[in-house]
Amino acid sequence: ATVYNNDGTQVDVGGRFDVALG
């Protein structure tokens, strides 16, 4: 899954779950 940190950086969490980091 592609998710975004609070600072707008993109994170790949392997598609297992979607989270908002930071």
UniProtKB/Swiss-Prot annotation:
Kindly give the membrane topology term recorded for this protein.
Multi-pass membrane protein
- A biological process term (GO) from this entry: monoatomic ion transport
Recall the GO molecular function terms of this protein's record. Answer: porin activity
Q: Name one GO cellular component term.
A: pore complex
Sorted UniProt keywords: Cell outer membrane, Disulfide bond, Ion transport, Membrane, Porin, Transmembrane, Transmembrane beta strand, Transport
The subcellular localization recorded is: Cell outer membrane
Specify the superkingdom: Bacteria
Q: State the function annotated in the UniProt record.
A: Structural rigidity of the outer membrane of elementary bodies and porin forming, permitting diffusion of solutes through the intracellular reticulate body membrane.
Under the subunit heading, UniProt states: Disulfide bond interactions within and between MOMP molecules and other components form high molecular-weight oligomers.
**Which family does the entry's similarity section mention?**
Belongs to the Gram-negative porin family.
- Which protein, by its recorded name, is this? Major outer membrane protein
Naturally occurring in which organism (per UniProt): Avibacterium volantium (Pasteurella volantium)
